[in-house]
Amino acid sequence: MARTTAHITLLSDLTPPSQERTWLTAPHPTLPIVATCSSDKTVRVYSLSNFRLLSTITGGHKRSVRTCAWKPHVQGESVLATGSFDATVGIWRRWDSYGLLSSDHTTAAAASEDADSDSDEWRFAVLLDGHDSEVKSVSWSASGMLLATCARDKSIWIWEDLDDGDNNFETVAVMQEHEGDVKCVAWHPAEECLASGSYDDTIRLWREDLDDWGQVACLKGHGGTVWFVDWEGVENVPAGLQGEEGKWKESRALSGPRLASCSDDRTVRIWRRVPKEQLQQQQAGTPFGGTGIPSIIRPTGTDETWEEEAVLPKMHELPVYAVAWSKRTGLLASVGADGRLVLYEERFVDGSAQAMDTDGPASAPLSTEWVAVGVVEGAHGIYEINHVAWAKRADRGREEGKDEEVLITTADDGSVKVWTVR
């Protein structure tokens, strides 16, 4: 059932905060901990059980740590990739209770409590050197075998973790099609498909074809730098729903997870891949298969067609720096230079779900719209907010038996705040 408004309430700050700008906070994929990147050249690891600092990772980078990402599917240890303005990428490892992969949230929370002050146990395993200037974003693939990095040098690098016990990584691709600073990279939640956003105002999608990585789509629509992209969760489109809404969602699922983006143009947009089946239907019976050009010069079979599905309500007065798509509820959050935290919900347009004629197809096709359901003004006072992320709630205030989420915002004042959404 659609909500009319959402109540976004401050739960806690993560303490102690950094005394310098913080860029991004990455929730661990399985444990109630997060890693926060700071301009003071460190990464701080906090507990989401008691909101206290567990470790400070130092000594690996010579300039600001701009980005970090936890490697998924690791047993017995935690592995963190960091990207810095010193143009390098670091891989850090820690053999301890951080690495307990437990479905029992209580056990995981206790594990995070045990890992208190031994920051020296973080091992700087390897330095990945290749970029010519500031690294802006790092992202692990869903399998955990590939690491994507991007930088101000306009390039995207893909590294393979050889997982040979010697911390060896191999460069498998360097893509340089972007015409400006590459601000972000994000892997598809289930496939080896990479999305990137850039100062050139475009979003590009990349896949491997015959051992060669290349661009399969270039999404144009933003009128400014694309600061951040985030994928929809695979489970956001549930199967087995009844009625016309169920049919509509199953049809949309053919496109796979959608992509959200935000920009200097103050907008948040949603992009959808057009399924090949739909393209074939559109092209049937038209010259040259609907492309208007002979097949000999048509794009290759690996190319994909993406379309802008929605522009969300304009809620920001300044550039939007980050978006976060809840993999559990489908809610979308955005933050930016105006200090606002905004929450959006996708709904069926009034009446469209009841527009079915009993004897035939819908008189008005089902459609959805995005509605802003919550806003926090000045979430970090006068400071710009650089990042937002969803995480599983882990503190003692959560409702027993409920799988709650929290929002985590990271800002220029060095603070990281945790919010509940009801």
Swiss-Prot record:
Keyword Coiled coil appears in the UniProt entry: no
Pfam families given in the database record: WD40
WD repeat residues: 13-56, 60-102, 130-169, 177-220, 236-281, 315-354, 379-420
Key word Repeat present: yes
GO-annotated cellular components: cytosolic [4Fe-4S] assembly targeting complex
Spans through the membrane: none
Keyword entries, A-Z: Repeat, WD repeat
GO process terms (BP): iron-sulfur cluster assembly
UniProt function note: Essential component of the cytosolic iron-sulfur (Fe/S) protein assembly machinery. Required for the maturation of extramitochondrial Fe/S proteins.
Family: Belongs to the WD repeat CIA1 family.
Protein name stated in the entry: Probable cytosolic iron-sulfur protein assembly protein 1
Organism: Aspergillus terreus (strain NIH 2624 / FGSC A1156)
